[in-house]
Structure formats: C-alpha cells, structure tokens
C-alpha cells in the first residue's frame, strides 16, 4: 500500500504542476495541459483496475486450477502486448495516425471480446463461484483495454473527442 500512496502523491504533484504551468504561462498551453490532465486520469484508472485484480487475488480468487487457465494466460499476454505497443506509440517522436488507428482497432477488438466474456458468464449455467470472479476479472480487463485506447488517442487528439467514441456516442467505460 505504500507504493500506492507514493503513486497517488506523484499523480497529485503532476496535476498541481500542470495547474501551476497554466497559471504562470497563461492560457496558451491550456489545450495541452487539459490533454495531459485527461491522460493522467486514464493512467490512474488503469492503475485502479490493476489494483482491483490484485484485490481479487488477495481475496482468494485463483484461476490456477481453472480449465480456462491457458486461455487466461494467453489473454494476459495479449493485454501486456497492448501495453508495450501503447508505450511505443507514446514514445514515438511523431504521431503515426495510421499506427494509432490500427492499434485502436486491435485494442477495441480485445475490449469487445472481454465484454463478450462478461455477457457469456452473466448468462452461464455454471455455478456462481466459478463465473462471478471471471466476469469481474474480465470487467477489469475491459476497462484497462478501453483506457489504454483512451491514452493513445488522447496523446494525439487531446480534447476534441475525449470521452466520445468514433460514432459520437459517449464513452462511459471508466
């Protein structure tokens, strides 16, 4: 929990520095500052979801003996790859709109898959002690994936479309 407190403190300091920047430098950078603030919030959300997964494990939830263990491991690897690719896109010196669009499409496929698993478990005939933890786990994965997409998209388009999906619908996947 000490690490969590240090991270929260660092996030608060970053937000404070962004506010001070606007106060000192004026409003010329307000769009970028708001974009960075939104980006930081999405990163915080991913951290919160990761903590939620840890708390599942701390509460005794284990998929080690699950018949779905291999698939869960493969999905974890895929999500890890999305993290790595997001980092590459964020570290690129120039925004590559095509690469970002391809990333967004692939990540959204994963997000939709996670939702399909949630839907499947919600109507499953399997015992609740099996499917409830899986549904909760997939909900956390879905939110992590959606926020990864949000981070990458916010990095290139900080304000005009934040919290809206491509079709104009509101993105409520916090």
PLM feature spans:
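Cytosolic, long alpha-helical scaffolding segments
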Residues: 1-174
């Amino acid at each position: 929990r000490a690490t969590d407190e240090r991270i929260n403190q660092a996030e608060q300091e970053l937000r404070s520095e962004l506010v001070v920047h606007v106060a000192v430098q004026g409003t010329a950078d307000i769009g970028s500052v708001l974009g960075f603030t939104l980006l930081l919030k999405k990163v915080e959300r991913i951290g919160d979801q990761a903590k939620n997964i840890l708390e599942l494990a701390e509460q005794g939830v284990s998929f080690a003996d699950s018949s779905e263990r291999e698939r869960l491991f493969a999905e974890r690897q895929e999500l890890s790859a999305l993290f790595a690719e997001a980092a590459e896109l964020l570290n690129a010196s120039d925004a590559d709109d095509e690469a970002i669009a391809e990333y967004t499409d692939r990540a959204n496929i994963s997000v939709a898959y996670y939702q399909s698993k949630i839907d499947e478990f919600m109507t499953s005939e399997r015992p609740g002690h099996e499917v409830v933890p899986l549904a909760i786990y997939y909900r956390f994965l879905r939110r992590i994936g959606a926020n990864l997409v949000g981070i990458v998209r916010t990095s290139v388009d900080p304000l005009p479309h934040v919290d809206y999906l491509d079709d104009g619908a509101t993105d409520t996947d916090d």
